[in-house]
Amino acid sequence: MENYSSNKDTYIKRMNQTAKSKFAVVESFLSKGIKILDFGSGISPEFISDIDSSGAEYYAYDISKTVQTELASMGVNVVTKEDLTNKEVQFDVIYLSSVFHEIISYLSPQERTETIAMIMNNLKPGGYLVIRDWANPNDNFLQIKIKPVSKQAEREMNTWIKELQRNSIIDQNCYKLVDGSISASYANAYEIIFHTVWGLKSLSRESKEQYNVENGIKKWIINPWEKELNLQTVYYETDETYLPHLQKYFKLDEVPFETKSIHIFQKNK
């Protein structure tokens, strides 16, 4: 949450830019009396307002004390880790939006297990676990060419590649071509493109984050919880608003990959 602390206005603006697409994913589950937990919520006033307008009861959980304080000052129902450990409230919907990749990027295996168990223990029988996150195609065979728009963009891209490889986010299936572009597997290209667009100011933080969530969802949710959870649907979205940001770095006519994956699970009754 360093971004929030250092530049509150920019942080909230960024959160609000994606609020409508974030809300659309869970809108059909919401009605009067439904309790929804925004797990790893951050601060998104527009999203909170949309939830309130649906008649559902909004609860937020975030590990940042700064975020907790800000949310409480807004009158939001803030849930603590202690509340979740003690199962103070049972939820009809638990929503992880752009959070699961952080769980698999930063938490130890033991912490991941404990976190997922905590989520499951606070989900009502028949309730829904909704995971909205990156959509890396996880394809290590198909190749794509990535061409930077300038020498500066090329240098920044190469800096990201170096750090992503150092942090084991991408492998060596990435080759420099004579024109300054690179050829990379779809899995690597996804990481390179969507990391580079953050800019070098975010290098130290974002270069540690894994955007390939498919394997993580299978390993940490589907396999260990197969007797308690049923995967209802998986679908993908492409956010075209990424294009102008990507075009600052790469020669692209369209967003080359789907940007979000949505996994919807239902807990057995």
Predicted regions and their residues:
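Short catalytic micro-motifs in class I SAM-dependent methyltransferases
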Residues: 98-103, 133
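Class I (Rossmann-like) S-adenosyl-L-methionine-dependent methyltransferase catalytic domain
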Residues: 1-56, 61-85, 128-269
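A short, conserved alpha-helix within the catalytic core of class I
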Residues: 103-118
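Local beta-strand N-terminus motif with an aromatic residue
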Residues: 91-92
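A conserved beta-strand element that flanks and buttresses the S-adenosyl-L-methionine
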Residues: 95
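Helix-to-beta-strand junctions that scaffold the AdoMet/dcAdoMet cofactor pocket
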Residues: 123-125
